[in-house]
Amino acid sequence: MKFFAFSMLIGEASPIVLALRRTTLEVRQLDPIIRSELEQGSSSSCPKAILIFARGSTEIGNMGVSAGPAVASALEAYGADQIWVQGVGGPYTADLPSNFLPGGTSQSAINEAVRLFNEANTKCPSTPIVAGGYSQGTAVMAGAIPKLDAVRARVVGTVLFGYTQNQQNNKGIKDYPQEDLQVYCEVGDLVCDGTLIITVSHFLYLEEAAGPAPEFLKSKIGA
């Protein structure tokens, strides 16, 4: 990734700004931006499934305001008490400079995601885990999942939106079954092509996050 053009001539009425505002407004109707059910939940009341999600760069909370809340809201069709939603926060600050690091994010962010996956396995060893990430959050998941060893088999489905390591990782995640992974790359989203050039397409994943992606995860979780 050699380029970064997020700030290039973005005016108040630019397509990128308008897309961001529209996405933010729509998603605010769906779900909170901070979710910590895994960390707060009790092993005596494990849910049907656990979702761990990593937000995109500069997004607030630990879920962000776009893809993460949309996926979580759709999965709650099982029942709000049947899904634990956990955002990757703490050491993962979703800062812009970390996009330039090897692997597209910081090691501390990856380690935090690994910690959460391991906590899910320890707290609810019979509960399937699903995962997701948007923008830099996709790099967090791509870095964390290969480090899970035995726990990796418990991650039954993963969805990635605007995968910043898409080209570098050959559209996959190392040591993770391709059939358990769904990558969403909008036409014109250049981060999926191995660059850090940000176009308006990078902000257009709400439809996938609210529909096809959670449906894929549901197919992996089961009825």
UniProtKB/Swiss-Prot annotation:
Its main location: secreted. Transmembrane segments: none annotated. It holds the Pfam family Cutinase. The record marks S57, Q136 as: Transition state stabilizer. SMART domains: Cutinase (SM01110). Disulfide bonds join C46-C124, C185-C192. The 2 disulfide bonds play a critical role in holding the catalytic residues in juxta-position; reduction of the disulfide bridges results in the complete inactivation of the enzyme. It comes from the Eukaryota. Gene3D superfamilies: alpha/beta hydrolase. Coiled coil: none annotated. The keyword Signal applies. PROSITE patterns: CUTINASE_1, CUTINASE_2. It is found in: Secreted. Keywords: Disulfide bond, Hydrolase, Secreted, Serine esterase, Signal, Virulence. One of its GO terms (biological process) is carbohydrate catabolic process. Residues 1-19 form the signal peptide. One of its GO terms (cellular component) is extracellular region. SUPFAM superfamilies: alpha/beta-Hydrolases (SSF53474). The active site is at S135 (nucleophile), D189, H202 (proton donor/acceptor). PANTHER family: CUTINASE 1-RELATED, CUTINASE 2-RELATED. Catalyzes the hydrolysis of complex carboxylic polyesters found in the cell wall of plants. Degrades cutin, a macromolecule that forms the structure of the plant cuticle. Allows pathogenic fungi to penetrate through the cuticular barrier into the host plant during the initial stage of fungal infection. Belongs to the cutinase family. This is Cutinase. It comes from Didymella rabiei (Chickpea ascochyta blight fungus).
